[in-house]
Amino acid sequence: MDPNCSCTTGGSCACAGSCKCKECKCTSCKKCCCSCCPVGCAKCAQGCVCKGSSEKCRCCA
């Protein structure tokens, strides 16, 4: 589990727009940094939306 997030890996979560998760893997969260983003992606904090490593992030394209 991410120390900055109460979400469980791969589970549902109630992250808000202010979510500070570093590597949130919640399937229901659209505000956390995505696993398909490169490390240090500055745009993750701006609401990057993608669901997994097989999907390219629109914010990182």
Swiss-Prot record:
One of its GO terms (biological process) is intracellular zinc ion homeostasis. A divalent metal cation 2 binds at residues 7, 13, 15, 26. A divalent metal cation 4 binds at residues 33-34, 44, 48. Pfam families: Metallothio. A divalent metal cation 6 binds at residues 37, 41, 44, 60. One of its GO terms (molecular function) is metal ion binding. Residues 30-61 are annotated as: Alpha. A divalent metal cation 7 binds at residues 50, 57, 59-60. PROSITE patterns: METALLOTHIONEIN_VRT (PS00203). A divalent metal cation 1 binds at residues 5, 7, 21, 24. A divalent metal cation 5 binds at residues 34, 36-37, 50. GO terms for cellular component: cytoplasm; nucleus. Residues 1-29 are annotated as: Beta. Keywords: Cadmium, Copper, Metal-binding, Metal-thiolate cluster, Zinc. It comes from the Eukaryota. A divalent metal cation 3 binds at residues 15, 19, 24, 29. Monomer. Class I metallothioneins contain 2 metal-binding domains: four divalent ions are chelated within cluster A of the alpha domain and are coordinated via cysteinyl thiolate bridges to 11 cysteine ligands. Cluster B, the corresponding region within the beta domain, can ligate three divalent ions to 9 cysteines. Belongs to the metallothionein superfamily. Type 1 family. Metallothioneins have a high content of cysteine residues that bind various heavy metals; these proteins are transcriptionally regulated by both heavy metals and glucocorticoids. This is Metallothionein-1B. The lineage of its organism: Eukaryota, Metazoa, Chordata, Craniata, Vertebrata. The gene is MT1B.
